């Protein structure tokens, strides 16, 4: 069981679900290690977005409110930081401030940036998992330490009936190491 293969398997499984769509940077064009995990997805389910993280998560929330289950891809935690407004003030709180009228479910995919074979410097390798667990009340954060966690975690995020959103945190270095 390999880390990358389990990610590809999970993405392939999610891609078979009629209400899922995948959005972010480098989902249709090569550019990150995550791109290759989407190679089995129907191209019509892939939405390439510009580098505008706050906008991306806002669009993801909108799709979820419309009945889709978006898999919103932020290749590194350091990029997801830029969507913190949408994450903390909207996705995490919308059920409360809408008096339970709205409870969108978004699957957020991010990673701790890889350091090997080339170290991209500190602005690309942050791990903010614990900080976001403290900030978020209705969005769960799951760090994927081992290959055998991956498929079940993505399946759980998709199948959960409580309409909670989930952030799944991958390790960029493990794509080739585990």
Predicted regions and their residues:
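Thiamine diphosphate
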Residues: 1-178
């Amino acid at each position: 069981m390999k880390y990358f293969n389990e990610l590809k398997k999970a993405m392939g499984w999610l891609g078979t679900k009629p209400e899922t769509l995948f959005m972010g940077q480098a989902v249709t064009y090569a550019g990150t290690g995550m791109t290759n995990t989407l190679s089995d997805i129907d191209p019509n389910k892939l939405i390439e977005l510009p580098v505008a993280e706050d906008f991306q998560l806002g669009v993801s929330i909108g799709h979820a409110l419309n009945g889709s289950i978006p898999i919103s891809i932020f290749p590194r935690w350091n990029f997801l930081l830029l969507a913190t407004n949408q994450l903390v003030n909207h996705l995490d709180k919308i059920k409360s401030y809408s008096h339970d009228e709205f409870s969108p479910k978004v699957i957020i995919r991010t990673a701790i940036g890889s350091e090997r074979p080339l170290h991209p410097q500190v602005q690309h390798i942050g791990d903010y998992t614990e900080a976001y667990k403290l900030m978020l009340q209705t969005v769960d954060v799951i760090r994927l330490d081992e290959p055998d966690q991956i498929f079940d975690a993505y399946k759980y995020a998709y199948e959960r009936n409580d309409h909670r959103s989930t952030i799944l945190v991958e390790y960029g270095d493990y794509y080739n190491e585990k």
